[in-house]
Amino acid sequence: AIGSFGGALKNMSIGIASTRGKTNIHTAAVTTDHEKLFSTLPQQDHFLESMADACKAVVDYKGKENILYINVANNLSIDCDCDSHPHAPEMADIGLFASADPVALDQACYDAVVNSPDPGKAALVQRMDSLHGIHTVEAAEALGLGSRRYEIVSLG
């Protein structure tokens, strides 16, 4: 199971989870036993929904008003940042994005890649779409974590 892109939602769920928590998320709550991880991987969408569920747990615990999200869109590779030998970056750096809404933030970053004039985006878009990566954003919106609607405000 791979999340497709490492935005705010992926990092809030997988990034801060313990080993048992990461296993629970990757298996869509089938097991917390890391030894059983690769024998119990769920359908891709179930994994992506599990990431959204984990995000909701974090937000419910910390409080929506206490969290600011920042995505650094640089060194954009087709591989997960957890890969010890990731593929080289495919695109030029896009920039920094910030929001109090993780759903809007990840949607904006996804759109920035898709709409980029950079020819290196092709491999990233193919990877994100082949893994249905936007589904985490859809699932998080359905859980009430935010809205996919956003407005970009450039600071310079």
Predicted stretch roles:
Residues 1-156:
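Extended, low-polarity segments enriched in aliphatic/aromatic residues
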